Amino acid sequence: MGNMRRLLIFAVLVILTVISNSKSSYKYDGSLFSSKELDYDETDTKAMGSVFSRYMSDSDAQLILDLDFFRHFFNYAEAYRDGAEEGNLELMKYAVEMVEKLKSFDISMACVGDMMHLAWTGVEYATHVEEHKNCSDCKCTPLFQQKKSERHWIFNVFDAMGKVPAGIMSGNNLWVGSWSTCRKIDVVKNAQGQKWKGQYCLATIDAYERDNPLVYFGNMMSGPPDKHCYDKTVKNVTDDGFCFALFPVLKFGVCMPNTCTNHDVKQMLSFAIRATEGAVGTKSVCNVDVECRAESYSDAMSENGLAMFALYLLIATVVLVTFGTLYDLFIVSKAPQDEKNSSAFNHPFIKFILAFSMYTNGSEILQSKKNDREINSLHGVRFLSMCWIILGHTYYYIGTSLTTDNLVPTLINFPKQFHTQIIVQAPLAVDSFFFLSGMLAAFSFFKKTMKADPNHPPKLSAFNWQTWPMYYYKRYIRITPTYIIVMLFDVTLFTYISNGPFWRPIERQGCSIAWWTNLIYLNNFLLQDQECCMGWTWYLANDMQFHIFLMPLLVIVFLKWGMKVGLGLSTGLIALSSLIRLIITQIYGYPPAPILTAKLQIVYQLNDYWNDVYVRPYIRCTPFIVGIVVAYLLNAWTTREQKDLKIKLERRTVIICWCTSTVLGLYSVFGLYWFAKTGDISKPWEILYTIFGTPAYALALGWVVFACTTGNGGPVDTILSWRLFVPLSKITFCAYLLHPIMLQIYNLSRPQPFHFTTFIQMIRYTVEAVFASYTIAFFFSLAFEKPLNKIDEMLFNSKKMMNGENGNTTEMVPLNKIRNSD
């Protein structure tokens, strides 16, 4: 591993050699470059290799960890910059010669010409410095300063490039340089007024799989830090030509002229790397990817038709919201009550305009009145679970964005701390929303059937053939429009919202291929081998599938055959789900849960674990089923005449249930601590957690909600039923859709790498993320979610949509009862 990284240092040196400030006695002549692209000459590799062979012979460094190596390396690299400043014509001449070698590569003539202009400007700068040394007349000083100022931009090119940063020993592979310095370079290069403009390019260099650093990371904290570089007991995998793709061995920023394409820069880097590998006699770099970011007309938002459509949609929405709010405040609210009930105010166009009123929509969201016949504790469960998810995603997106300069030691030490199991097990929070989803929808069904007046048949019937198709339709139509708008903004407007060395379009590539799988809620099955679109929405796919298959099955069984059969079927489905999970994890050697351990090799498994286990509905269905069971029990154990849902239980029963629930909850969250800390787990404990980990959490949460709803929750109910959670709960669906986008924008917009420090640091970032996500979700709900729901009610109200030809009606479950959010 040390040798591999050392080679990358050499590659950087070659790049700096080629493009640093230079000098030559030659005159710069653009006619030297023909449009014909020549084949690569291997003699260039040998020539360049000899340069570095001489350098290596002068260095005592054998490892990347040797600081003397870096001192020699940067002294050598800085010599080119100093050569221009000190007027070293011989060194500048050598730089021009090296640039001329680029003519032999598959590089565009415009790029080579600008590279030569850079080198020749260095020659001119050095020449003026040399001339000024021999000038005794003070009158030549102003002229020298003018010429020096005109050519001083070449040092910005050098300064903008990546340098070896601090933290090399802790795996800092982000040598990003200065994006802003490079982008500011804009100088006239000839009499025709053509310009030399800087563009920032980030090179990603991948190692071979045989040099997989994860082989060493598990034990790198013991013994000398370089022991694995010479330890003969460490056996590399066969050189099968595969690249180590989990993360790059180096990300290196270079400043290039904007005439160079990604391909051009890749060719120059490949030349440098091949030269370095030729010098040491081994191949260490498997692949080089380059992404250059230059402002071009074709990249402008005005040239993106879909982005312009999204922009016009946003503008139109702002206009509608403004007009609807003003009309509501100054016309409707001041009109007498009898006029409000008139046909004029009930005209479809007026209703359409008022659907966008921030005043009315905001009042509805902020309304925090509680109802004794509702499950008030679910508001707190929903919001706190969303905070838990944001906490986990804060860590996840910082880590997976590969913008952290101390990622390796953080990943090694993170799972060893007991309190961090709360973050490691954050995926359990998703189970909270599966539970809420099943419980709320089932509760509404059971309430309207089991608590119906005997003298008046219930409007809602689980056995009516119209009920379930319309239930599916209403669920789809209430969720999908908001989902589509978030997706549209994500792949268009959010692409242009920021910039920087790490910035990239967040979901454009994945959504351009897989968007349709999201709209049919099968993105947890289809195109799993490709980049997904809004990967966090796998939850919506699972949730929709649960409502299509499990909801009618269990509701009908409970209503037709009663509690015993319903509980028996529910238990059987949960046992079958756990058994399937156990079989898959044992066959493929997956961990019992998607957690990080001290042995980082587990990262290899988590990607396949995602596809085979994490997003599969037949494995994630347990909390949804438990939610339906709790909903049935709440309705079965209360009477229609009750004004609330209180159930009197014996004190001993309540204490036993709370103790059991606490044990189950702690087991589900902290039960794999030793596995996370050491990377080792006994087979019995692994099987036990695989089978009971998820059901334990679902049962614990089920008791908490049941106890709080029936009056046995005590202070827990007081906290979860806090009125402040009510409005926050209402916008959690939008917060769920938007918060990963906010986190990615934040992580990818930084000009410099992120540095992990303490747990408190991440708590602060999480609080900021929660605040930002819910603030944006509030306005997004005002502008899109609430208006779309009201328009849906206008177009497809229950009487028009549900009346059959025989006059029977089926009342749909209200939106706030069927939709929940992750």
Swiss-Prot record:
Leader peptide range in chain numbering: 1-24
Pfam family, one: Acyl_transf_3
GO biological process per UniProt: lipid transport
Protein family: Belongs to the acyltransferase 3 family.
Residue positions the entry lists as glycosylated: 236
Top-level division of the source organism's lineage: Eukaryota
Phenotype on disruption: Increased resistance to fluoxetine-induced nose muscle contraction. Slow development, embryonic lethality and defective yolk transport to the oocytes leading to accumulation of yolk granules in the pseudocoelomic fluid and appearance of pale eggs. Reduced level of sensitivity to dihomo-gamma-linolenic acid-induced sterility.
Species per Swiss-Prot/TrEMBL record: Caenorhabditis elegans
Tissue expression per record: In L1 larvae through to adult, hyp3 and hyp5, the most anterior cells in the hypodermis, and in intestine. Other hypodermal cells show weaker expression.
Transmembrane segments: 306-326, 617-637, 655-675
Major subcellular site: membrane
Matching InterPro entries: Acyl_transf_3_dom, Nose-resist-to-fluoxetine_N, O2_lipid_transport_reg
Keyword terms of this UniProt record: Developmental protein, Glycoprotein, Lipid transport, Lipid-binding, Membrane, Signal, Transmembrane, Transmembrane helix, Transport
Protein name stated in the entry: Nose resistant to fluoxetine protein 6
Subcellular location: Membrane
PANTHER family: NOSE RESISTANT TO FLUOXETINE PROTEIN 6 (PTHR11161:SF65), O-ACYLTRANSFERASE (PTHR11161)
A GO MF term: lipid binding
Record GO cellular component, one term: membrane
Function: Plays a role in the uptake of a range of molecules including lipids and xenobiotic compounds from the intestine to surrounding tissues. Mediates transport of lipids from intestine to the reproductive tract. Required for efficient yolk transport into oocytes. Vital for embryonic development.
Membrane topology classification: Multi-pass membrane protein
